[in-house]
């Protein structure tokens, strides 16, 4: 695989963080295809202005959320996190590469990366840990899918990750069939799905998910693949994530950031290729940029 598309859901609030990400991709990611930047329609002009100075060398396509997921107009209460997850799945209908990279604005590419290095033999790496970190994610996935997860007490990697567009299409087809057959979830989740479907006058997989929140994209995706025996067609079990879990900054106390350094993540070749400085920590984009320095400057 020589070229790999990527998707970045974005709001204007995180545009400054996205500028750091885009500069890091331009420097380090060889073979990046189209970067699908999906944002609220009302924010698109402002976001376009914000990213224009750092888009050289990147094939950025801005796409309104409402064009990719028109069903969102029926669920105006859906929070941004769930909207972004839906975007990461729905983009499979637009991407041109078999595998595509999911991104958030707080991700930074810190090493030379390429599609062939990240996905040897065209299969996407998937890292799991033997810890039940987010049991609620998997309970929600089983409820929405109507499937039983074959493995319990595990957690799959999160963003940045690689998804296979055919695998996502098969997940969408499964959800579409459930929506068409009225196979809604039990309890309040199912009541919401029924009411929204009736009000919208339509049933489709995107609406089923939007009305059936809470959900998480990776728990849905990997649970579906494992429960239906499809995992090995598209993924292999990897000893590490695309991102440096220990070297990323996840903590919610911004005061701890003074002691954080990206240096360990820069050593060596190969995985992990990314770090995350989570936006909800309160660390400003300027502080992140100062820490990263040469990692995000143009060569």
Q: Positions of the model-derived regions?
A:
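N-proximal low-complexity "stem/linker" segments adjacent to membrane-targeting elements
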Residues: 1-23
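Short, acidic, metal-binding catalytic loop of nucleotide-sugar glycosyltransferases
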Residues: 24-32
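Short beta-strand/loop segment that forms part of the nucleotide-sugar
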Residues: 33-43, 63-65
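Active-site-proximal specificity loops/subdomain of glycosyltransferases
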Residues: 47-93
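Short aromatic/hydrophobic "clamp" motif used to bind/position activated sugar donors
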Residues: 100
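The conserved acidic donor/metal-binding loop of glycosyltransferases
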Residues: 104-108
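Conserved donor-nucleotide/metal-binding helix-loop-beta segment in metal-dependent transferases, i.e.
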Residues: 110-145
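Catalytic core and acceptor-binding pocket of nucleotide-sugar-dependent glycosyltransferases
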Residues: 156-260
């Amino acid at each position: 695989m020589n070229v790999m598309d990527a998707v970045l859901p974005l709001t204007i609030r995180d545009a400054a963080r996205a500028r750091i990400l885009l500069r890091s991709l331009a420097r380090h990611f060889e073979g990046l295809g189209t970067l699908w930047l999906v944002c609220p329609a009302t924010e698109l002009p402002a976001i376009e202005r914000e990213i224009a100075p750092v888009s050289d060398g990147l094939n950025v396509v801005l796409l309104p959320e409402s064009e990719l997921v028109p069903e969102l107009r029926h669920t105006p209460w859906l929070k941004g996190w769930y909207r972004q997850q839906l975007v990461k799945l729905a983009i499979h209908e637009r991407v041109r590469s078999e595998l595509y990279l999911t991104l958030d604005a707080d991700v930074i590419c810190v090493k030379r990366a390429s599609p062939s290095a990240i996905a040897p033999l065209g299969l996407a790496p998937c890292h799991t840990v033997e810890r039940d970190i987010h049991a609620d994610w998997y309970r929600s996935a089983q409820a929405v899918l109507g499937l039983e997860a074959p493995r319990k007490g595990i957690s799959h990697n999160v963003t940045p990750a690689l998804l296979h567009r055919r695998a996502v299409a098969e997940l969408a087809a499964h959800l579409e069939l459930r929506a068409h057959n009225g196979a809604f979830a039990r309890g309040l989740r199912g009541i919401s799905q029924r009411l929204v479907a009736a009000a919208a006058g339509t049933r489709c997989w995107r609406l089923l998910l939007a009305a059936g929140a809470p959900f998480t994209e990776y728990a849905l995706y990997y649970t579906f693949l494992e429960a239906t025996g499809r995992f090995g067609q598209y993924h292999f079990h990897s000893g590490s994530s695309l991102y440096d879990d220990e070297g990323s900054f996840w903590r919610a106390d911004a005061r701890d950031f003074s002691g954080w350094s990206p240096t360990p993540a820069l050593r060596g070749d190969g995985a992990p290729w990314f770090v995350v400085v989570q936006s909800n920590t309160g660390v400003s984009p300027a502080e992140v940029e100062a820490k990263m320095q040469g990692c995000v400057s143009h060569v």
